[in-house]
Curated annotation (Swiss-Prot):
The lineage of its organism: Bacteria, Bacillati, Bacillota, Bacillota incertae sedis, Caldicellulosiruptorales. InterPro entries: P-loop_NTPase, Thymidylate_kin-like_dom, Thymidylate_kin_CS, Thymidylate_kinase. GO terms for cellular component: cytosol. This is Thymidylate kinase. The gene is tmk. Belongs to the thymidylate kinase family.
Length: 206
């Protein structure tokens, strides 16, 4: 495909959303066509799935979560990601398959291999050119979430949950190619400088 597919992953509170906004601005200033999107929630159907998944009123089995996320991903890949990449856009996505592997495969106990199998149909269609994994110690990440007043289902999980997510992203960053792990404990600008360098390296290969 003509475009490039960049995915931001990481534990909650690591600053993904902030970095994605900075990357979007940076790339547009350099003349690139850019689409920013997210999973779940990058389509109208996905937005409804996101509300369901993050609503604290609903307690779900890990496999149920994984199947809902796969439904969201199918809509997203077909209606947003593939068209944008075919049109030559740089697509910057907040979460993709690695999040399913960590949250449902590892933390919820569905199993890494099961999540990989479930999502293999999407890997046959498109693959990210770069995974940027932002990791932040769960102690600091939880402080950030509290300061931001976040209160959805994931944000209100206990410390052990957030520790497992943090360790899960550390683990998957070693399992898959095209993953760059960036420690997110510095200032926003410090982290962005690291992010910018790996994105510049990718785009030089065009």
């Amino acid at each position: 495909m003509k475009g490039k597919f960049i995915v931001f992953e990481g534990n909650d509170g690591s600053g993904k959303s902030t970095q994605i906004l900075k990357v979007e601005k940076y790339l547009k200033e350099k003349g690139y066509k850019v689409v920013t999107t997210r999973e779940p929630g990058g389509t109208e159907v996905g937005f409804r799935i996101r509300k369901l998944l993050l609503d604290p009123a609903y307690k779900m089995d890990g496999l149920t979560e994984a199947l809902l996320l796969a439904a969201d991903r199918n809509e997203h890949v077909k209606n947003v990601l593939i068209p944008a990449l075919e049109d030559g856009y740089v697509v910057v996505c907040d979460r993709y398959i690695l999040s399913s592997i960590v949250y449902q495969g590892i933390v919820r106990g569905v199993g890494v291999e099961n999540i990989i199998k479930l999502n293999s149909i999407f890997e046959e269609k498109i693959k990210p050119d770069l995974y940027i994994i932002l990791t932040l110690s769960p102690e600091i990440a939880l402080q950030r979430l509290k300061m931001a007043g976040k209160n959805d289902k994931l944000d209100t999980e206990n410390f052990d949950f957030h520790r497992k997510v943090y360790n899960g992203f550390k683990e998957v960053s070693k399992m898959f190619k095209k993953c760059v792990n960036i420690e997110a404990e510095g200032t926003v600008e410090d982290v962005f400088e690291k992010v910018r360098k790996v994105i510049d390296d990718l785009l030089k290969k065009r």
